[in-house]
Amino acid sequence: MMMRCVNGQTAQDHLVTQLPGLSGNIGVKSYTGYLLANATRGRYLFYWFFESMRNPSQDPLVMWTNGGPGCSSLGGEASEHGLFLVNADGATITRNPYSWNRVSNILYIEQPVGVGFSYSNSTDDYQNLNDVQAASDMNNALRDFLTRFPQFIGRETYLAGESYGGVYVPTTAYNIVEGNGKGQQPYVNLVGILVGNGVTDAEADSNSIPPMMKYHSLISIKYYEEGYKACQGDFYANQNLPACQKFLTDSSNAMGNINPYYIYDSCPWLGINLQQKLKTTQEMTFQVLDPKTQQPVKIHPLFQMYKHGGWSKRVANERNFAPRFETDAPCVPNQSIAKYFRRLDVQQALGVRRKTADPNGWNICTGIINYTQVYSTILPFYAKLLPHIRILVYSGDTDMVVNGLGTQAAIDKLQLQETSSWRTWEFDSALGTVVGGYIRKFEKSGKGLTFITVRGAGHMVPLVKPDSAFYMFKNFIDGTCC
């Protein structure tokens, strides 16, 4: 039997007391370790936990995941809303004045297995990952965390994530709700979820990309109209028609080497020289299943840019060379983050006990996993969750990859009652009161779904607009917004 310490954690958990590159003490209690996700297969998910700086004994517990699939949640900690942000030199870190642990106890989990420091004793798992297994593993890992830290049993709990987290978060939330109903222990007091620029519904998400390109002058109105005709009014359904496919490919190539995750920015660190150095014929396998036949379907790369291989394909097609094997999130200055977490002294400080599953070492996104997208739409999960929890869906409005137009179209499919129509939301910044974005509210069975845009933000909202993101997050978990 594992001996339990007085403050709740077990001998499996590592108290982080210092971090290389940090000037001064950490300042909060922080733990790392490996959470049991599946006992039969021996799957373990690495986590990094930070106590709240406000009131750790009362503030909610928030579990965060990044997307990919295959991208590490430590990237969210180190570049978005974590307490410590990795500097460009990859050697030093800076305290983040807008860290989300200022008002919450936050748990970053690297998942699925094969990502970051997470691993499986059954190594064939890395080639057989999917949405169903990921949700089950996250549910189990969270309950294992509560077992180790029983002070959070019964505490208000939120799940949060971005990008492919739009699949991870709702599916995991429903797995938790079902588990609670079946008596799975310990009980998780799940009260809400937050999804940022999240993959939601394949049809709505995909059909919004060409209009987004038109509205932001990335393609001409005339060419858009020609493409709309070639695709017979439905870009997603008719993407494999030769004329439609040509329009999608040509539109994709016409953008040039911009950053589709933040369209008013360039993508210098995904330059052609770097691509040519790293090119290979191999790339991560990612299958999408047809919901009716459960057979793999062919999806155009323009509709798969949220997957870190999709952008590679687009640039490769444009420049007429083989796509690179993506081992990092495109258009994010992440090499500094990889450099930091690959350091032996950093891994020792974090209590890392074994090598990464990725032979290349820790990467912000791994290329070793094969992942199958089981759900082409997450809307049924939203419908099932609404009677139980609050939902916040937020969208940086300069992201083309998973943009707010598609997210709104997806939400409208739920046919919810709109309780508050489109209006601004504001917050106090260093410049005074500013418009943070726009908001719509919906309701079903007494629980609410709120859609928020974050003005000027991209795919990873806290990366570009940390102040807006913190205000939105704080007010949602405090119940003063949405």
UniProtKB/Swiss-Prot annotation:
Its EC number is 3.4.16.-. The active site is at S163, D399, H459. It holds the Pfam family Peptidase_S10. InterPro entries: AB_hydrolase_fold, Peptidase_S10, Ser_caboxypep_his_AS, Ser_caboxypep_ser_AS. One of its GO terms (biological process) is proteolysis. PROSITE patterns: CARBOXYPEPT_SER_HIS (PS00560), CARBOXYPEPT_SER_SER (PS00131). One of its GO terms (molecular function) is serine-type carboxypeptidase activity. Induction: By growth on mammalian cells. May be required but is not sufficient for increased virulence. It comes from the Eukaryota. SUPFAM superfamilies: alpha/beta-Hydrolases. The keyword Phosphoprotein does not apply. Belongs to the peptidase S10 family. This is Virulence-related protein Nf314. The keyword Transmembrane helix does not apply. Keywords: Carboxypeptidase, Hydrolase, Protease. It is an enzyme of class 3 (hydrolase).
